[in-house]
Curated annotation (Swiss-Prot):
Enzyme kind, highest EC tier: transferase
SUPFAM superfamilies per record: S-adenosyl-L-methionine-dependent methyltransferases
Cited InterPro entries: rRNA_ssu_MeTfrase_G, SAM-dependent_MTases_sf
Species whose genome carries this gene: Clostridium perfringens (strain 13 / Type A)
Function: Specifically methylates the N7 position of a guanine in 16S rRNA.
Keyword Transferase appears in the UniProt entry: yes
Protein name as it appears in the record: Ribosomal RNA small subunit methyltransferase G
Residues reported in the UniProt entry to bind S-adenosyl-L-methionine: G78, F83, A129, E130, R148
Family, per entry: Belongs to the methyltransferase superfamily. RNA methyltransferase RsmG family.
Domain of life, per lineage: Bacteria
GO CC annotation terms, alphabetical: cytosol
Gene Ontology molecular-function annotations: rRNA (guanine-N7-)-methyltransferase activity
């Protein structure tokens, strides 16, 4: 129970319940992450305490956005090692979480975690973001699309906003310095049917890190021309 108090403090700060069952799931997730990381590249963060703070608590703090407390369906686009989707699924067993990633090795890891943790509310999809968003069963089908992927907001918006229902939200977990990036992305967000709702700053317990949750409202349907074909989204970001 070495990290229980630290994680509970983070949960308390965003109004989420934390208990021993959730803690044990996170610890098993941590062990599987370290084990698989020796076979495939999942994370550069490998120390137990750092995983707890910079992965788990960072994702738990996403619940500072009330939208995550109310949503019934969430898709994590470009989920990688499962962040923030798996922590959201552990914290809220009543929400349906879809984890989407383009690399099959990562999907195999995620399936193992889901099975070992006994998470009944998670499904995984092996797909590129821009391909998945063109599938009828995924497009404009989620209350929230989220991502902690390392890409600028113009790119992330085109990858994520098409998955969101009208009146839903795109929520990006971003680092500390985002003012210029957001100014550059406002037109792109609008083109895709979104409108910037606000930015929520979060402190990561046990560190001196401050991160930002960028919250976008989906106010109208995304034009059928988006997302563009593979490669164009990153090579020629929307302006």
């Amino acid at each position: 129970m070495q990290y229980f108090d630290l994680m509970k403090k983070a949960c308390d700060s965003v109004g989420m319940e934390f208990n021993e069952d959730k803690y044990q799931k996170f610890m098993l997730y941590k062990d599987l992450l370290k084990e698989w990381n020796e076979k495939i590249n999942l994370t550069a963060i490998t120390e137990d305490e750092e995983i707890v703070k910079k992965h788990f608590i960072d994702c738990i703090k996403a619940f500072k956005a009330d939208e995550f407390k109310k949503a019934k369906t969430v898709i994590d686009v470009g989920t990688g090692a499962g962040f923030p989707g798996l922590p959201i699924a552990i914290m809220r067993e009543d929400v349906e979480v879809t984890l989407l990633d383009s690399l099959n090795k990562r999907i195999n890891f995620l399936n193992e975690v889901v099975n070992k943790l006994g998470l009944k509310n998670v499904k995984t999809i092996h797909s590129r973001a821009e391909d998945g968003a063109r599938k009828k069963e995924l497009r404009e089908n989620f209350d929230i699309a989220t991502s902690r992927a390392v890409a600028n907001m113009c790119v992330l918006s085109e990858f994520c906003i098409p998955y969101v229902k009208v009146n839903g939200n795109f929520i990006a977990l971003k680092g500390p310095n985002i003012t210029e990036e957001l100014n550059d992305s406002k037109n792109a967000i609008g083109t895709l049917g979104g409108k910037l709702k606000g930015i929520t700053e979060v402190e990561i317990e046990g560190t001196d890190l401050n991160h930002n949750l960028v919250i976008v409202d989906k106010i109208k349907s995304t034009p059928k021309t988006f997302p563009r074909k593979a490669g164009n989204v990153t090579k020629k970001p929307l302006k």
